[in-house]
Regions:
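Short catalytic/metal-binding and nucleic-acid-binding patches
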Residues: 1-160
Length: 160
């Protein structure tokens, strides 16, 4: 995958995909996936981004986020913060992430719902769960409270 230009501001909502180095199943273990979620929630609680949906798969993750900082900075914090902690706390050595990531700005309510469905069903498509709610490394399955959908994406009938 060619590295796209990531010149973004913190004003949009984005669908993100980031892969582990050479698509290795580095996030397959409970320790690694759990640590990634800790890092994800930590930067969210620091106000770096709003988190609308997520799933951590064995070799990649998907997010629906609205960055408060730039999108580039949000991904740098997540990936870099996780790498630092995985090396320090779990003794991991070697490359963890591919350098690039995929981002798509969410334009409207229909697109938001399509990405939300994609994120929630990703573990089902990969045979890791029978439903999104059964997969604990996802917003559908771990019971965490998510940030609200930005008003600008909601149809006028839902904005009131």
């Amino acid at each position: 995958m060619a590295a796209p230009y990531h010149g973004t501001t913190g004003s949009g909502t984005y669908f993100i995909t980031a892969c582990t180095f050479q698509k290795q199943s580095l996030l397959q273990s409970d320790r690694m996936a759990g640590l990634f979620l800790e890092v994800l929630f930590n930067y969210r609680s620091q106000g770096k981004y709003l988190l609308h949906e997520f799933v951590v798969m064995p070799d990649h993750f998907h997010l629906l986020i609205t960055p408060i900082v730039t999108l580039e900075r949000a991904l740098q914090l997540m990936k870099g913060g996780f790498s630092f902690r995985a090396r320090k706390e779990l003794g991991f050595s070697g490359e963890i992430w591919e350098k690039s990531y995929y981002d798509r700005r969410v334009r409207d309510w229909e697109e938001y719902l399509a990405f939300q469905k994609y994120v929630r069903l990703n573990p089902v498509r990969r045979g890791l769960a029978k439903s999104g709610e059964e997969y604990r490394y996802s917003s559908a399955g771990c019971g965490v409270r998510l940030d609200a959908v930005p008003q600008r994406l909601k149809p006028s009938s839902l904005s009131a």
